[in-house]
């Protein structure tokens, strides 16, 4: 839409969550002139990047009375994209040579990502906006504004009114557990990757890992360091897939999907192979869930599609007072959070206008129809994949901010190609030095780094 003709408006906005999305949302809202309060349940900023050795009391996270742990980070986790493309556009995620405790690798550990987010919060004085150890209990629309009930870790309740709510609570807390015929009578151990931390508990076991992308690829190889055998069940594989991989201890196999589990401990794959397993690890993703949010029926979640959202951000009937930052998964997440946040901030200040409710609903219906036409299931509505660059550039144009850099887009493309073709080595061996050079020269030209690019290159 064209820039709005209305006078600039300052809103009182609450941001739910102080992870990467919440932090950059708070910054962009504040830059736009809004007053901002961030509500965060943890004791520090960082969201899902805060590692905890604790796991939930229910390893599958199905028991509604379980003790909930919000981190899904495992001890050995490293990023699956180069650090240059991960950072916010004006605060590069580059090595900190002034601190020997920091991880300077191009694909660093989860601890380095958390440290980067803490650096970002300090640089822009974001922590002064954050109320820590606050759980959001309920959010609902009231007379054109939003009422937010929350409580402290000590049980003290708060009831406040805001002009707008920006939901940045993430979507890595409610695990999705794949259905396996016969699993109820299967006698072995079961755990979702949300509760996986270290491989030790699987020593000398035969383990089946369901899922072979990102966490599945990582965790299967982590467990294979100590397990007797690890068998990966991959939905992306052909039905007759059966391949032995020589790493890390010549004890890792890739299969097609699981067909059935039996009470004698056996797992039968669709390729006909039978494995007697001790444990199953589900690396099968997560569900969107917003238990605190009351929208009077305007929104719902259907097969993991959050309905209805204009461009994955604004629910037409409740916009612009309610918005979501960070729903789409995969790709350049931090930059997506930043661009979406700029859009939300500009819309709330009336510097940019949204289409009418009817026009937004028409756009959503057309989007759903396009997914149906090519056979994409509802559960993949928020997986942008190859169209993420097009999506981000559209949002950037809406709010008048720069488009995503060429080098950043290409690092994503080539990074994922390496991940698929060389899952064992892609983090430490790469073939895109040209893109890394382009990135650091870009940082230097914009005066975003204090060292010469040759120090890295």
From Swiss-Prot:
This is Flavin-containing monooxygenase FMO GS-OX2. It is an enzyme of class 1 (oxidoreductase). FAD binds at residues 17-22. PANTHER family: DIMETHYLANILINE MONOOXYGENASE (PTHR23023). One of its GO terms (molecular function) is 8-methylthiopropyl glucosinolate S-oxygenase activity. Catalyzes the conversion of methylthioalkyl glucosinolates of any chain length into methylsulfinylalkyl glucosinolates. Its EC number is 1.14.13.237. It catalyses: a (Z)-omega-(methylsulfanyl)-N-sulfo-alkylhydroximate S-glucoside + NADPH + O2 + H(+) = a (Z)-omega-(methylsulfinyl)-alkyl-glucosinolate + NADP(+) + H2O. It comes from Arabidopsis thaliana. One of its GO terms (biological process) is glucosinolate biosynthetic process. Disruption phenotype: Increased accumulation of methylthiobutyl, -pentyl, -heptyl and -octyl glucosinolates in leaves and seeds. InterPro entries: FAD/NAD-bd_sf, Flavin_mOase, Flavin_mOase-like, FMO-like. It comes from the Eukaryota. Keywords: FAD, Flavoprotein, Monooxygenase, NADP, Oxidoreductase. Disulfide bonds: none annotated.
């Amino acid at each position: 839409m064209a820039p709005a003709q209305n006078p600039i408006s300052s809103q009182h906005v609450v941001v739910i969550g102080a992870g990467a999305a919440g932090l950059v949302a708070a910054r962009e809202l504040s830059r736009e002139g809004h007053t901002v309060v961030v509500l965060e349940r943890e004791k520090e900023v960082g969201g899902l990047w805060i590692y905890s050795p604790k796991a939930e009391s229910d390893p599958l996270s199905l028991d509604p009375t379980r003790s909930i742990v919000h981190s899904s980070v495992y001890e050995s986790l490293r990023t699956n994209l180069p650090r240059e493309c991960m950072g916010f556009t004006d605060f590069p995620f580059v090595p900190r040579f002034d601190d020997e405790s920091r991880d300077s690798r191009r694909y660093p550990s989860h601890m380095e990502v958390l440290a980067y987010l803490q650096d970002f919060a300090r640089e822009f004085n974001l922590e002064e906006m954050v109320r820590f150890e606050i759980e959001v209990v309920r959010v609902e629309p009231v007379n054109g504004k939003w009422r937010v009930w929350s409580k402290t870790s000590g049980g003290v309740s708060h009831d406040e009114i805001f002009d707008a709510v920006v939901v940045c609570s993430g979507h890595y807390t409610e695990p999705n557990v794949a259905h396996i015929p016969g699993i109820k009578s299967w006698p072995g151990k079961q755990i979702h990757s949300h509760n996986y931390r270290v491989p030790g508990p699987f020593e000398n076991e035969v383990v089946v890992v369901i899922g072979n992308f990102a966490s599945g690829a990582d965790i299967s190889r982590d467990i294979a360091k100590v397990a007797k055998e690890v068998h990966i069940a991959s939905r992306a594989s052909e039905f007759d897939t059966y391949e032995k991989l020589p790493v890390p201890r010549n004890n890792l196999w890739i299969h097609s999907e699981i067909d059935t589990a039996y009470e004698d401990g056996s797992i039968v794959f669709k390729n006909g192979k039978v494995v007697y397993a001790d444990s199953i690890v589900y690396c099968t993703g997560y569900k969107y869930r917003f238990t605190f949010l009351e929208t009077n029926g305007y929104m719902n979640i259907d097969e993991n599609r959050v309905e209805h959202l204009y461009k994955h951000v604004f629910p037409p009937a409740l916009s612009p007072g309610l918005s979501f930052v960070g729903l789409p998964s995969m790709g350049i997440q931090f930059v997506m959070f930043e661009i979406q946040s700029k859009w939300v901030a500009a819309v709330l200040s009336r510097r940019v206008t949204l289409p009418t409710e009817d026009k937004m609903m028409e756009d959503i219906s057309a989007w759903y129809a396009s997914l149906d036409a090519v056979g994409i299931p509802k559960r993949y509505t928020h997986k942008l994949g190859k169209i993420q660059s097009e999506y981000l550039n559209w949002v950037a144009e809406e709010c008048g901010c720069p488009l995503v850099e060429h080098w950043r887009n290409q690092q994503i493309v080539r990074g994922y190609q390496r991940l698929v073709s060389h899952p064992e080595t892609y983090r430490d061996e790469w073939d895109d030095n040209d893109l890394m050079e382009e990135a650091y020269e870009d940082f230097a030209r914009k005066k975003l780094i204090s060292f010469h690019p040759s120090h890295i290159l």
